[in-house]
Amino acid sequence: EKTSEFDKWLRKLNDLRAKAKILLRIQKLEKDEHFGDCEPVGDGIRELKINYAKGYRVYFKEIDGKVIILLIGGDKSTQQKDIEKAKDIWKKIKK
């Protein structure tokens, strides 16, 4: 599952190679649940790092080792803002 914010971010991403790498990484998550380079950022939200170009990030909520929702994406330059946005999105969803 993914949010409209995540869809919007991915649609606006102009770097097609980066978009392909991000989608492939998400697909791997869905198939074998191997998170790879990933860290908790608070409130049960995790940051998936895609080490390519700008250092893309995907923020998601995970329960019992399974990704349940893709919240938002960004890159290294907007990391702190994206983490706060992901937390806000999650708070709205769980209400």
Which sequence ranges carry the predicted segments?
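Short beta-strand motif preference
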Residues: 57-61
